[in-house]
């Protein structure tokens, strides 16, 4: 009778948990821009262009091969990549909750302790959808835990199972291998496997990871994602990164107390727990140390969902007495209540003020009104149907994924953060004392945009020319081109020389010519969010503003996304006359910096052309809302 009652209680817990989760996840389902980078690659694959972000350029712009393959297969069956990006994470996240409650707790009572933080954590709920790989990571973590406990307690599986799951986890989120090493080591050490048995198990288990790595080297030319090379080249000192990493942890504690609170609770419990729980706790600590060492992430809480899941397992396995049970449950409920405002009750309204000086953002809140399932219309599900009819090239960083989906396959996006660009990923990041984690901009070599558009090497820098030629052979020429393997070996084994350091510290001219725009006084666009670059003007070094009529310039103003120094000059009788350097003194709510120009002395000669020059800065500039007046009235 007791066994039947226990079964009924567990069944009721599972059903009630899934019911709550379905409501919460449908309400909060969204798609992140980083996920849209993967979706564009899938879209290109399904349309016959190959698994590439920009057609004709073999670059792995996604970090999660197994997630990419899962979404690609599902998109092929479903027929719509956007529907797939909502549906697959939702189904997988519900499966994870069922798997957790079915196999982890000893009974329904301890199951409640584990499921409370998973339901109330803003981070866990946000990234149970999002289109990112978190749900698949959670699935493989749970399978690894189930397998490890089965081997540890019942010796039901061979170590091959753990190694195979680790291999699949590597293909989903490579750094999570760190977190499961301790429990894998416990399983191996406890059972005294022979060397030959371990070697056989390791060989079989590593087949998926090795097979993918060999394919990646052959197809893309490199063993790791392009994103890894872009982020490894950031040049940020380790102590600065660790400082930012600690801020990332603190940010989570403020925004989402139940996540960090549950992790700390689990680590405390593990001090008196059994061997496997101590192994899980060690995995949490190692992974947290890794997170801190890389500077965390710009998406608040994203990297803490795996440690939270490990913590839920530890809490569930703790089997506390009645008093401790009540104390732990009360603590989790209080912390969960504090986090509740950031879960299903969270507003979808977002201001750029929410991105603190730390550069960490509530990413779902930013995208909720744009990609949230509760907010999107039918047109959103037809994103990839909108295409450029002719080939075009644009330079961008933020909003890379959705810009690519909206632009279609004929739009080549140069990602100056390097995530999707093979050359820029291998150049040093531009030095910026106000760096933001995950957004390390590069300076484009001179004439790089023209080289992409014309499909030939027009660069002027000898060092960049060499790298670009090698990358052209690796990423653009046919796979079996003679000499391609040699270039792959050279690019992977030979380090770049110090002559490229000037891309980090110097101001590099990006174009041989200065672009010009015609100034239209009427209908100046209103400022939108900092991620919206529509109705704006981009330039890399300087830009000319052509006036419809000559006037005596008394004042001028514009908005810029970056707080740089700009030199204002004007043409008079064909001669460029420098006037004044200006710096921003104010920032709008939407994150733009306001620039106002007034000459030190009243000008007495007219001009019909004004030049804005950035003597130094990021190498990529976006200006909006030009206003030129003959009276000193710009606001």
Predicted feature descriptions by range:
Residues 20-24, 114-120, 142-143, 159-173, ...:
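Membrane-interface alpha helices of multi-pass inner-membrane proteins
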Residues 55-61, 65, 69, 76-98, ...:
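Loop-to-helix entry region of an early transmembrane alpha helix in multi-pass inner-membrane enzymes
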Residues 87-108, 143, 147:
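Transmembrane-helix motifs of polytopic, lipid-linked glycan transferases
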Residues 105-106, 144-161, 188-192, 272-273, ...:
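Membrane-interface transmembrane helices that cradle and orient dolichyl/undecaprenyl
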